[in-house]
């Protein structure tokens, strides 16, 4: 429970029709009433709006406002909350805030309103983080995922898993503490193994969907690679329908990364055009090539571009080898030239590349671009998204805790195979239970809570 009253501007600072100053604390209504000319706010009902004026210290009018009152416990923070709807100018908003802070009210820390809502039991940690995700959403899918978190679908996943784990721990502990009681159901290693197998399956399913949700929310980091002059920059420009990257017949034109974003049927592709990889004596081009090779390790998808108008070159073969263990799609560019040189050369090289692996495209007339987009979505299992698919995690912190829980169960499986004593099993079960608890904020450390909420904007 907090005893001080806090305030902050909740709307973006700038010129607009209305700005909102949010005030929270058990004394917030009484304090704002001291500087308000209009109906007595202490006597208003909760969830009501009152017209009036904010007064200066000399009792002159500072601004004409609408005051929204939300009384505990039915407010965002769980405390008494007042929202002052003032005129939206930068100066007048700041002056109203300063007048509020002249009372027994202090400026809120970033995220403190949401932190109070969490600590007062108005939301769990997933819901709090979903608010931040909603504010920073960059596409429609990210909004849907955030709404799923706010509606507690993901919280229910965690709660269900924890209930199953707690029930299993309880059965084990009862059998250890009271082995002599005949009316207590006996827990066997076989039964524990079946329960653990089911929990592992559930966690693996959650992880699979959560990884997809991360792509839905954040997009796919996509590296465009190839030897010089195969049309990498032309491909980037074709995606965007604009000249983002310089296109030239001179090899080595692109020496640094050129980045852009493309909406691939609802999925964001973070496209990165890279320096063409080849042997060169140019020191600047060498730096670009080295950076490209490092970026290969960070890419979530590689678009390897080959030139259909040329036979497979040694540099192409080296790139095919370099990227063979990475998620990649091979593109045959310049399809508009109607050349079969690339395909005809496949049988005479060591690349072991089959013609059907190549998606034929033209950066000039957009031939094959729809097929390329569909191939990308299919590769990441994003080609048939259903509403229920959004009811999983996308936050890296949540996914990490799911992975910790999964590893605990995998360790438990090994202990079961080795027929270890039954009391040992509770150790891994407890680890998994605590890892999942970290997601919703159960027994969360204060330092982590402060860190999470400090990332929120002021006034939220």
From Swiss-Prot:
InterPro entries: G_TrmE, GTP-bd, GTP-bd_TrmE_N, GTPase_MnmE, MnmE_dom2, MnmE_helical, P-loop_NTPase, Small_GTP-bd
PROSITE patterns in the cross-refs: G_TRME (PS51709)
Record's cofactor remark: Binds 1 potassium ion per subunit.
One Pfam family it belongs to: MMR_HSR1
GO biological process: tRNA methylation; tRNA wobble uridine modification
Domain of life from the UniProt record: Bacteria
Residues bound to Mg(2+): 233, 254
Domain TrmE-type G stretches: 219-381
Gene3D superfamilies attached to this UniProt entry: P-loop containing nucleotide triphosphate hydrolases (3.40.50.300), Probable tRNA modification gtpase trme, domain 1 (3.30.1360.120), tRNA modification GTPase MnmE domain 2 (1.20.120.430)
Residue numbers binding (6S)-5-formyl-5,6,7,8-tetrahydrofolate: 22, 83, 122, 460
Record keyword GTP-binding present: yes
Coiled coil regions, renumbered to chain: none
GO MF annotation terms: GTP binding; GTPase activity; metal ion binding
Annotated binding of K(+), by residue: 229, 248, 250, 253
Cofactor(s) the protein requires to work: K(+)
Compartments where found: Cytoplasm
Alphabetically ordered keywords of this record: Cytoplasm, GTP-binding, Hydrolase, Magnesium, Metal-binding, Nucleotide-binding, Potassium, tRNA processing
Xref: NCBIfam families: mnmE_trmE_thdF, small_GTP
Family statement drawn from the similarity comment of this UniProt entry: Belongs to the TRAFAC class TrmE-Era-EngA-EngB-Septin-like GTPase superfamily. TrmE GTPase family.
Purpose: Exhibits a very high intrinsic GTPase hydrolysis rate. Involved in the addition of a carboxymethylaminomethyl (cmnm) group at the wobble position (U34) of certain tRNAs, forming tRNA-cmnm(5)s(2)U34.
Quaternary data: Homodimer. Heterotetramer of two MnmE and two MnmG subunits.
Protein name: tRNA modification GTPase MnmE
Organism: Onion yellows phytoplasma (strain OY-M)
């Amino acid at each position: 429970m907090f005893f001080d009253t806090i305030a902050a501007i909740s709307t973006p600072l700038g010129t607009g029709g209305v700005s909102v100053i949010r005030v929270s604390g058990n004394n917030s209504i009484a304090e704002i009433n001291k500087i308000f000319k209009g109906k007595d706010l202490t006597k208003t009902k909760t969830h009501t709006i009152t017209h009036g004026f904010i007064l200066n210290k000399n009792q002159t009018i500072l601004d004409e406002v609408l005051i929204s009152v939300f009384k505990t416990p039915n407010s965002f923070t769980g405390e008494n909350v007042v929202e002052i709807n003032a005129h939206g100018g930068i100066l007048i908003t700041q002056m109203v805030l300063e007048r509020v802070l002249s009372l027994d009210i202090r400026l809120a820390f970033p995220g403190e309103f949401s932190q109070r809502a969490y600590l007062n039991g108005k939301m769990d940690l997933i819901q709090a983080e979903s608010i931040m995700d909603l504010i920073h959403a960059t596409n429609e899918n990210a909004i849907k995922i955030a709404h799923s978190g706010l509606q507690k679908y993901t919280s229910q996943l965690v709660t269900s898993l924890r209930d199953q784990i707690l029930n299993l721990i309880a059965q084990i502990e009862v059998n250890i503490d009271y082995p002599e009681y005949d009316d207590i159901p006996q827990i066997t290693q076989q039964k524990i193994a079946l329960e653990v197998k089911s929990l592992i399956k559930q966690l693996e399913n959650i992880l699979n969907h959560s990884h997809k949700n991360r792509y839905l929310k954040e997009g796919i980091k996509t590296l465009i690679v190839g030897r010089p002059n195969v049309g990498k920059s032309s491909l980037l420009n074709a995606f965007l329908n604009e000249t983002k990257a310089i296109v030239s017949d001179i090899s080595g034109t692109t020496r640094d990364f050129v980045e852009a974003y493309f909406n691939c049927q609802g999925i964001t592709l973070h496209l990165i055009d890279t320096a063409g990889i080849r042997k060169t004596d140019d020191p600047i081009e060498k730096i670009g090539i080295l950076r490209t090779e490092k970026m290969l390790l960070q890419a979530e998808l590689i678009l390897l571009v080959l030139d259909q108008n040329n036979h497979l070159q040694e540099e192409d073969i080296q790139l095919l080898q370099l990227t063979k263990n990475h998620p990649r799609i091979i593109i045959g560019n310049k399809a508009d030239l109607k050349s079969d040189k690339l395909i005809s050369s496949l049988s005479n090289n060591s690349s072991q590349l089959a013609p059907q692996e190549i998606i034929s495209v033209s950066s000039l007339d957009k031939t094959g671009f729809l097929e390329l987009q569909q191939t990308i979505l299919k590769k990441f299992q994003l080609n048939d998204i259903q509403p229920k698919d959004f009811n999983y995690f996308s936050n890296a912190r949540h996914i990490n805790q799911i992975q910790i829980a999964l590893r605990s169960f995998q360790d438990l499986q090994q202990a079961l195979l080795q027929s270890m004593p039954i009391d040992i099993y509770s150790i891994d079960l407890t680890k998994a239970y605590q890892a999942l608890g970290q997601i919703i904020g159960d027994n969360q450390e204060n330092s982590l809570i402060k860190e999470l909420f400090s990332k929120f904007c002021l006034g939220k």
